[in-house]
Amino acid sequence: MTHPNELPLSPLSALQFYATAPYPCSYLDGRIARSQVATPSHLINSDVYTDLVKAGFRRSGVFTYRPYCDGCRACVPVRVPVDQFEPNRTQRRVWKKHGELIATVAPLHYDEEHYALYMRYQSARHAGGGMDRDSRDQYEQFLLQSRINSRLVEFREPLRDQADAPGILRMISMIDILGDGLSSVYTFFEPGLPNTSFGTYNIYWQIEQARSLKLPYVYLGYWIRESPKMAYKANFRPLEGLIDGAWCVLDPTSVDLPPVDLAIHGKRPPLKP
């Protein structure tokens, strides 16, 4: 059990932090990962979770964690400062392209249409990774269980024909509402349409939603320089990262991080016990 001294004493002092056993890294092939888990989950309300996110934690269902890998700091928590965000030409084009999508914000709930879209997305984007075989229970545990202020956002095309009512579903996004921003939990979308850039549109939408709520940040989870799947996050500028316990503006092309190869030497992570 560890109590990271970079975390404030209250209200996080009631939590305990445990390191998991090593497991295969889901981001970098051939790597071994570990996580640090915050428990008990019933004490992690929205205020506590806001502080945890500031310290680099994320959640999967009611499981709250952050990377705790031996000698590797490849996973960088990142966020976009809303008032400073400047969309590039590609992002503006995507925003205009999908401007007709209708977003509906709702409490977390199960819907068979959502689950079917999730399975199509996993089969197309992550075939063989395990999530393409998720049962309904696994889907609900992953995305629909939360003890904090969470929302499900539907993105549909405008209703053009009664046969398509209530409009063709294109994307689902789960977000958490924090004290200082929105946290992007997970997004999945229709995978069979070419050149849609739904993911880019979704982040842009979250930034504009945070702006309308007068929230200063959108937290995007972890960015990994060596992972092509994470590259899109670096396109949102300015991008801030949590480096050595402090949030600072990142230059994704030259951010000073230890090489991931340090992991093979068994060095301890840069976290104090």
UniProtKB/Swiss-Prot annotation:
One of its GO terms (molecular function) is arginyl-tRNA--protein transferase activity. Its EC number is 2.3.2.29. One of its GO terms (cellular component) is cytoplasm. It is found in: Cytoplasm. InterPro entries: Acyl_CoA_acyltransferase, Asp_Glu_LeuTrfase, N-end_Aminoacyl_Trfase, N-end_Aminoacyl_Trfase_C, N-end_Aminoacyl_Trfase_N. The keyword Lipid metabolism does not apply. Its main location: cytoplasm. Belongs to the R-transferase family. Bpt subfamily. Functions in the N-end rule pathway of protein degradation where it conjugates Leu from its aminoacyl-tRNA to the N-termini of proteins containing an N-terminal aspartate or glutamate. This is Aspartate/glutamate leucyltransferase. It comes from Paraburkholderia phytofirmans (strain DSM 17436 / LMG 22146 / PsJN) (Burkholderia phytofirmans).
